[in-house]
Amino acid sequence: MQVLPPSSTGGPSRLFIMRPVATTLLMVAILLAGIIGYRALPVSALPEVDYPTIQVVTLYPGASPDVMTSAVTAPLERQFGQMSGLKQMSSQSSGGASVITLQFQLTLPLDVAEQEVQAAINAATNLLPSDLPNPPVYSKVNPADPPIMTLAVTSTAMPMTQVEDMVETRVAQKISQISGVGLVTLSGGQRPAVRVKLNAQAIAALGLTSETVRTAITGANVNSAKGSLDGPSRAVTLSANDQMQSAEEYRQLIIAYQNGAPIRLGDVATVEQGAENSWLGAWANKEQAIVMNVQRQPGANIISTADSIRQMLPQLTESLPKSVKVTVLSDRTTNIRASVNDTQFELMMAIALVVMIIYLFLRNIPATIIPGVAVPLSLIGTFAVMVFLDFSINNLTLMALTIATGFVVDDAIVVIENISRYIEKGEKPLAAALKGAGEIGFTIISLTFSLIAVLIPLLFMGDIVGRLFREFAITLAVAILISAVVSLTLTPMMCARMLSQESLRKQNRFSRASEKMFERIIAAYGRGLAKVLNHPWLTLSVALSTLLLSVLLWVFIPKGFFPVQDNGIIQGTLQAPQSSSFTNMAQRQRQVADVILQDPAVQSLTSFVGVDGTNPSLNSARLQINLKPLDERDDRVQKVIARLQTAVDKVPGVDLFLQPTQDLTIDTQVSRTQYQFTLQATSLDALSTWVPQLMEKLQQLPQLSDVSSDWQDKGLVAYVNVDRDSASRLGINMADVDNALYNAFGQRLISTIYTQANQYRVVLEHNTENTPGLAALDTIRLTSSDGGVVPLSSIAKIEQRFAPLSINHLDQFPVTTISFNVPDNYSLGDAVQAIMDTEKTLNLPVDITTQFQGSTLAFQSALGSTVWLIVAAVVAMYIVLGILYESFIHPITILSTLPTAGVGALLALLIAGSELDVIAIIGIILLIGIVKKNAIMMIDFALAAEREQGMSPRDAIYQACLLRFRPILMTTLAALLGALPLMLSTGVGAELRRPLGIGMVGGLIVSQVLTLFTTPVIYLLFDRLALWTKSRFARHEEEA
């Protein structure tokens, strides 16, 4: 029968040691809550940190960029600019399309932003053109966010117009209704319509004009209310044959009479079923297709949204004819799942490595089982809290848990090692557990709260980076907190029941050999420590040198923002000469597609040509290149991009810009490259002067590659210079001229065909097959005041000019975006500094302002706050340690270990060729919390030895170092092995995880070697300083 120690021993652990059943059931409850939480947690690539973003699209076929800007974009911008919570407003006005992107503050709910946008559109309605075919349409989507899923719809038997009609009514609408879907776009432009192609010579010969034809068609096709008859006994609804549904009906339409004979539309025009916009086209690989891009709402969960789409697809495709084939070309969730699975595997590897190192040190199966239970219990219990906080299982939270593996085992190791020491001295297991847990309880609390204090500044990081790492910091803090609870409850209880003198003394050949090895290591460490303590100033100079070296490394190490990920999808922009037509661009696109599809890493390709909400001009094309899975290709995405660009360079007359899609999207515009820099002015003339000069200098910088600009001011314009006096004499005004031109060349939507399922347009244009180019303007006829027909050439001269293909605004002022990539041998920090230096040499006028955008702007913000973030972490730790130790000096001793960790981390990043990005910075901040554990364990035991055994400070710290050497080595190796799988990561998403592992492993190795010697020396130096200070105060008091 064991004699119980007095009730004062055991500290907070006593109750749990004495009540094993209650303790076990409490841990089972934590385990079950964690398992349930894990099953309920959503899966995503990263925490949901999207800015609330809304895109407003207005289509006005035939309108020039200048007309779109002044008549559509500007009135809408004035209303949007008055909305509260608006962070940034950008717009792009091109031929026939206005796209305005509204980005709101992170704190504003998306639904509130939606209400404000709708109210602003309503307020601007009266200011918009009266003949606008459709009102502005808004979507809760970030246009720069790559689609979560891309589908291609093809048919070998049906025309694309019929295919799009079915897809729009039967598939796209249903997918749009799925929760989380922000926008479904159909690229390819094959919406059904009746196209009326006027024969200009025919109508001129008959004395007619295009306006006569337009008026006849609009009057012949109506769909309006007609009333009803209410008799004594019956009510009758009125109806009529006021609708024309087919091209044949329109051919038979009488548009005029001549000499008593009817002139039908078919006599003067080709009327056919066709596409609403003939200048749009999309291809899947080499086959013409309707490409369906599904984008999510900001904040929506990608995995659950994609799963819902896939569940619905079989049902939707069953409603389509057998000749129509629906193919999923890309699904971002495939790579997201693979990345999360790889991170989960690395988490399991970290747990296995940590348990292995525990066994290596303890050499006892029961003693290994105890922390082997504590580690997964702490991690699994974290899932329950994550559900409560609306977190997800993503790369960052799983990285936090992987790193936590090395943290959470530390507490259990410290407790087991201390209890085992008493058992080996002859104490009974229960008494040893109570005594050992009570003795170590304060150390556990110090370790836990000082480590959590390091994470507190992460919660106060601003903007999107702070939101991004909020889940990381809280997940890690929760795991550490649960670990402390388990270590003070379950661990000592299990030690009291599972450990014994017999089990600890039982040794096999491996145990005996390893014990001798550890004894030799400790003896060698003791001899080295004695020498170091005899030469304190030399050791102090080493510590100061590490501080200086860490500062120098911080200044010179290449700096970046976020690792470039290989998600298996490449976005591309194809650029041709500014005067390129749709036909010419489509031909060039097919040439490029042939080259791209020959690459062995490419699985599929979708491409799009034409002007719509995503593509600003006819001389550009959008591409999405889907790569094979990572394990099926030899090269990562950056090498594939370099290879594709080299191959496409052989295609004459085009420039190809490629960038890999990323899980973190900060930009609001689809860019040609990864990084952006803007020039903003009060006028387009100022931009036209300075953009070429800046571009010329930037293209010469070695720190930049793929430098391009969206400034395109060489678009061909046929300027119709009307002699207003001559026109007035003939009774012709400018509205007549505009109408005639719009009827002929604007693909004008002049009437609507209504059906039960959809609405279709009647499109009016001139047939220009026989009169291409500017010669087509000679066929334009206008009606004079006396009813005669007047050729346009009699009242106007045609001048060929240049004008912008698109006009871009940022916060209502003209802007140009310069896009660039960074070569492999330079960092983003180098590129940013080079641009800023170049800008200074130009001496830009005051009305030109410059600013980095998207990721580059976030990089500048993060870089500026990093130093303060680390300072805040150090200050927070000092405050916590000062409160716990009731001392101003001991926290400084503990914090003196930090420079060694910084040196190790920065050196490791340099050797590995990694940039100092936000992921690596998080690793350095975590190192601050890890390496101070060594000092805490040393100082705690040294202070206890001085206080309880009356040892001198030198003897106390010397004995503490030797006594705590094994747990220090064990906990450091556990943390190192917890980070090792991240450092060695090679799977999907490895780019994101590797910097964290590299920094932590390097920092732990260097700090482990140095702090074992520098901390005791600094402890003694501060002890002497304290004694000297006390003696000075005592002397002053005596003199007083």
Swiss-Prot record:
Cited InterPro entries: AcrB_DN_DC_subdom, Acrflvin-R, Multidrug-R_MdtB
SUPFAM superfamilies, per database record: Multidrug efflux transporter AcrB pore domain, PN1, PN2, PC1 and PC2 subdomains, Multidrug efflux transporter AcrB TolC docking domain, DN and DC subdomains, Multidrug efflux transporter AcrB transmembrane domain
Keywords carried by this UniProt record: Cell inner membrane, Cell membrane, Membrane, Transmembrane, Transmembrane helix, Transport
Primary location group: membrane
Pfam families xrefs: ACR_tran
One GO location term (cellular component): plasma membrane
Keyword check for Transport: yes
Stimuli inducing this protein: The mdtABC operon is transcriptionally activated by BaeR.
Subcellular location: Cell inner membrane
Transmembrane regions: 16-36, 347-367, 369-389, 396-416, 440-460, 472-492, 537-557, 863-883, 888-908, 911-931, 968-988, 998-1018
A GO molecular function held by the record: xenobiotic transmembrane transporter activity
Membrane topology: Multi-pass membrane protein
Protein family according to the UniProt entry: Belongs to the resistance-nodulation-cell division (RND) (TC 2.A.6) family. MdtB subfamily.
HAMAP family registered for this protein in UniProt: MdtB
NCBIfam families linked: PRK10503.1 (NF007798), RND_permease_2 (NF033617)
Function: The MdtABC tripartite complex confers resistance against novobiocin and deoxycholate.
Subunit (UniProt): Part of a tripartite efflux system composed of MdtA, MdtB and MdtC. MdtB forms a heteromultimer with MdtC.
Protein's recorded name: Multidrug resistance protein MdtB
